[in-house]
Each structure stands twice: as C-alpha cells, then as structure tokens.
C-alpha cells in the first residue's frame, strides 16, 4: 500500500525547503522516498527529483504559446496535466509499485489551486483511485501571519477552505517557527494560535487594526470569517523549523498517523522500527512550544549548536570529513531521540 504527502501552501512558506528536508530525513531513518515536483514554474529544485512536471509541460512554454501571464499560465498547465494524466500516472505507478517509494509531492504556491480550482484535486483523486495511494495533505503557512490578528483570521479561512476542498487527511503547519520571536511579542501564548482557541479574544486587537472607515468595514468581514471558522471547529496547527531536528521528527510522527503509514509500513519497508515507535506514540514530543520557541528559544538554540559542535569534533577524532552533511546530523538527532524514549532503532 503506497503512502504520500501532498505539500501545499502560499508562496514563500518553505514548501521546497521542507521537501528537501523530508528527503534527507527519510534517508536517515531508512525510508525509501522520492520527491515529485508538481510546480511547472520551479526550475531550481533543491532536492533530487524522481518525477518532474516540467518534463511534461513548463510555465515558460505555456506563457509564450498561449499569451498568458504567470498565474493564468500555471492554471492552464495544471489543467493540461489533468486532461492528459495517463503518462504522468504511469511514472508515479513505477515509483510506488517497482521502487516501493514513499512519495512527497511539492505543489505550486498559488492558493487558488487548492482552494477553488479543481484540477489539482482531480489529479490526486485519480492517483488515489488508480494506485490506492494513502495521501496526507501538509499545508505549510509562514508563522509571520500570527503577528497580525486579521491576517491570522484570513489564514484560518484559507486552511479551512483547503481542508474542505482537498477532502483528504490534512495537517496544517506553521513553518519557519524559529523566526517568530524576531517578529515581536504576541498578545497570547503560542498554543493559543496553534490550537485555534476562543477567537473572541482577538476582537479588541482586530478593532485596533480597523481604525479607519475602510478598516471598520474590513473588521466586520474579519468578524464574520472568525465566526465561520469557529463554527466548523476543524483547524489546528503543528509548528516546524526544518533546521530543528526534533520538530521535524515530531511532525513526521503526526503525518504518519494521519495517512495511516504507521499501520502499513511493513508493506513499504525500510523503517519498521520507526513505524513501531510511532504506533506506540513514542515519537510525538510532549514539549511546551511556548517554552521552546518563545520563552527560552536562545537556550534551546545554544544546546543545538553545542550538539552540532560536539558532532563535528567527534567526526574529526574519527578522522572523517570535518563538514558534517545533513544525513549525519539526522542520524545524530535520531540517536538522541531514541535515548530520550529509551529505545534503540535498528537501521
């Protein structure tokens, strides 16, 4: 049974960086994975790509041939793939049936593709039907949107709409969480925003933003959106810093539960011990995100830097290369995680 992540999110939310981090992380735990680029405009991929939509269609060609702008060209490209999907699915089939690969789909950043337009949804539904892939949507959103109450409310609406549109297991993630403290102090604790607690507490802050005549009209709209999100009560968030190994480990544990990977890992192979630990709940960190990313961020960052320095020294003592690559760092982070959980992964 094949499994996959569909990585979506607004432009600049760190989707390609996350996919690259996933590739390194899965290599470290022994999970055979492949990344699929679904963005016809992305010609500078930071990761090795197994299947690239640009081999079928590119944004530059569409814009030139159809006289379309970037957004229109992207919509046209995805529609074209939707209408002639057979060869693309054949390549995906080879990855999941012959290579037994866990897939990560790196999607375009235009939000209308996963909130209002049906082509991207149709593509994944066809793959789900023909290949029986168990998907989980990972919706990355820059944590900067937490700094403004009205922007936070708008992001909640975007996340809700994406969940309803894609109709798949869905994990919303505030990315670049290591940058949040530099944006200024938040009026509430971090878990207020990740758990989407009582939104009525935001009302006085929304009123402050809407002091002008036009702002007051937007305040009424924001209030209506707030009520809608509260009525559905579906949205919540995880947090992620790709450079922080523990937050990445924690997120992958959550995703593996969402798409059912922990119950079918033996059919994929390569990381059954990780899957067993996930089933037992050992990989889900029970740490205070307010403490880690706001109150004592500098302390935790210093500890991480000390660990990295110690690893470099260890490599030097073993007469290995001084430059520790990402997979070495993942191996080290996983060993530390195992020690905390009192287990020993066999890789």
Curated annotation (Swiss-Prot):
Top EC class, one word: hydrolase
Record carries keyword tRNA-binding: no
CDD domains linked to this entry: GPN2
Superkingdom of origin: Eukaryota
Motif (Gly-Pro-Asn (GPN)-loop): 69-71
Subunit structure: Heterodimers with NPA3/GPN1 or GPN3. Binds to RNA polymerase II (RNAPII).
Additional observations: Present with 9230 molecules/cell in log phase SD medium.
Protein name: GPN-loop GTPase 2
Gene: GPN2
């Amino acid at each position: 049974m094949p499994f996959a992540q569909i990585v979506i999110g607004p432009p600049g939310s760190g989707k390609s960086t996350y996919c690259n981090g996933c590739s390194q992380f899965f290599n470290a735990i022994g999970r055979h994975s492949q990344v699929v680029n679904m963005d016809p405009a992305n010609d500078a991929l930071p990761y090795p790509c197994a299947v690239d939509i640009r081999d079928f269609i590119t944004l530059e060609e569409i814009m030139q041939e159809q006289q379309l702008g970037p957004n229109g060209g992207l919509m046209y490209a995805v529609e074209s793939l939707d209408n002639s999907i057979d060869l693309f699915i054949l390549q995906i089939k080879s990855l999941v049936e012959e290579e037994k690969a866990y897939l990560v789909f790196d999607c375009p950043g235009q939000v209308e593709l996963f909130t209002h337009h049906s082509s991207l949804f149709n593509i994944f539904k066809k793959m789900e039907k023909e290949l029986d892939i168990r998907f989980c949507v990972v919706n990355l959103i820059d944590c900067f949107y937490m700094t403004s109450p009205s922007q936070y409310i708008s992001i909640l609406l975007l996340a809700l709409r994406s969940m309803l549109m894609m109709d798949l297991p869905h994990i919303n993630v505030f990315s670049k969480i290591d940058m949040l403290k530099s944006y200024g102090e938040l009026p509430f604790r971090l878990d207020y925003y990740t758990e989407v607690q009582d939104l009525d507490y935001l009302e006085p802050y929304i009123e402050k933003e809407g002091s002008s005549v036009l702002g007051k009209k937007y305040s009424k709209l924001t209030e209506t959106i707030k009520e809608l999100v509260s009525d559905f009560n579906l949205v919540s968030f995880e947090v992620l810093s790709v450079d922080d190994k523990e937050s990445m480990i924690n997120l992958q544990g959550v995703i593996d539960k969402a798409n059912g990977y922990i119950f079918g890992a033996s059919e994929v192979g390569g990381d059954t011990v990780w899957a067993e630990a996930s089933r037992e709940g050992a990989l889900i960190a029970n740490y205070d995100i307010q403490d880690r990313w706001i109150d004592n961020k500098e302390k935790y960052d210093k500890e991480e830097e000390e660990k990295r320095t110690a690893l470099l020294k260890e490599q030097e003592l073993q007469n290995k290369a001084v430059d520790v690559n990402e997979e070495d760092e993942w191996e080290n982070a996983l060993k530390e995680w195992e020690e905390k959980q009192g287990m020993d992964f066999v890789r």
